[in-house]
């Protein structure tokens, strides 16, 4: 049997960090806005006719094997830690090889690890006979990722991976609700440049410091988060109205707010790239994820996307990413045929 799954990464436009529990409980109306992009995370499982478990990450260049009898050792396995903990959680009863690959650059701030998490959960769940309904995938993903990074993890990334599209994610005491946003996606695609700066980042470190300070009662951080909440809600309204002038204004005004929350959200190289984009037709810059490296999304003036991309491509180490909006989220496909089994 062969199982293949894929899920899209995302660009977050507003509300980042407020999706981390328990922070959203302190800000009534907390929400994020993001859209899924066609830089996919993929997982492939091939069953075996022995008891071996083989885990391989193509983009990380890592591979190791164990056995069904030693599956409990995966709980504390440092190699390919996310994959190991997911396999330990699902505890399949047949030998298999699991291979993963991500199209997004490592440390890009596009939710690559969270997206891979969802893709692997979809495939592993199929392997164990659809033990969980899809509505359980996101809570499982958040719990396992928290075990890996050892700090609380935000929830918005899993929703874009599982469902795709453009959405506002609303965080309430009784539930987290995904609201699909019906907007002019064509305009979104022709006005946003996604740039990988060439500098990877660690989102857990940045977000944990902010979370700790918020819980410790830092009033300035509380007020910044109130503004982040308002930005998300205002951006949602502007997108639903297809008011792209207002979208640009909101994104431009939110950048200093994010810098106040985390001064290290940009590096000197990122500041250089942002200034170059703004001088060549970009209206606003949005650092993707927790920042400190990774990707930047630029909202451009009408008919200016190509000029912005050309200017940024001239900078050493920077890579303009080719993306499309991904309307589809997680997909899982099964091929059941004994001829695909890996022999002893």
Model regions and ranges:
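C-terminal nucleotide
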Residues: 1-14, 18-20, 26, 34-35, ...
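Conserved catalytic cysteine-centered active-site region
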Residues: 92-99
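Short pre-catalytic strand/loop immediately N-terminal to key active-site residues, enriched for Gly-Thr
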Residues: 104-108, 283-285
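DPxDG-like acidic metal-binding loop motif
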Residues: 110-134
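Glycine-rich active-site/cofactor-binding loop and its immediate structural neighborhood
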Residues: 293-295
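Arg/Gly-rich low-complexity intrinsically disordered repeat tracts
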Residues: 337-344
């Amino acid at each position: 049997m062969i199982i293949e799954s894929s899920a899209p990464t995302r660009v977050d436009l507003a509300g980042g960090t407020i999706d981390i529990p328990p922070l959203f409980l302190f800000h009534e109306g907390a929400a994020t806005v993001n859209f899924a992009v066609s830089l996919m995370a993929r997982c492939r499982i091939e069953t075996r006719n022995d008891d071996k478990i083989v885990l391989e990450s193509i983009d990380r260049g890592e591979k190791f094997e164990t056995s069904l009898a030693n599956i409990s050792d995966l709980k504390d396995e440092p190699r390919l830690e996310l994959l190991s903990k997911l396999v330990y959680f699902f505890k399949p009863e047949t030998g298999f090889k699991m291979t993963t690959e991500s199209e997004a650059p490592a440390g890009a701030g596009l939710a690559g690890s969270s997206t891979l998490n969802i893709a692997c959960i979809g495939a592993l769940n199929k392997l164990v006979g659809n033990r969980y309904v899809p509505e359980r995938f996101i809570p499982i993903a958040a719990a396992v990722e928290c075990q890996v990074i050892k700090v609380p993890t935000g929830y918005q990334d899993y929703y874009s991976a599982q469902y795709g599209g453009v959405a506002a994610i609303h965080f309430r005491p009784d539930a987290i609700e995904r609201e699909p946003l019906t907007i002019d996606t064509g305009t979104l695609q022709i006005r946003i440049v996604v740039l990988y700066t060439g500098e990877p980042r660690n989102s857990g470190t940045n977000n944990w410091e902010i979370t700790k300070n918020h819980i410790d009662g830092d009033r300035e951080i509380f007020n910044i988060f109130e503004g982040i909440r308002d930005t998300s809600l205002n951006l949602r309204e502007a997108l639903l109205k297809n008011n792209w002038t207002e979208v640009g204004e909101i994104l431009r005004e939110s950048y200093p707010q994010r810098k106040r929350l985390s001064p290290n959200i940009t590096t000197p190289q990122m500041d250089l790239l942002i200034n170059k984009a703004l001088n060549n037709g970009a209206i606003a810059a949005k650092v993707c994820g927790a920042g400190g490296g990774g990707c930047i999304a630029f909202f451009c003036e009408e008919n200016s996307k190509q000029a912005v991309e050309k200017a940024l491509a001239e900078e050493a180490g920077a890579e303009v990413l080719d993306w499309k909006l991904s309307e589809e989220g997680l997909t899982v496909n099964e091929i059941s045929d004994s001829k695909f089994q890996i022999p002893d």
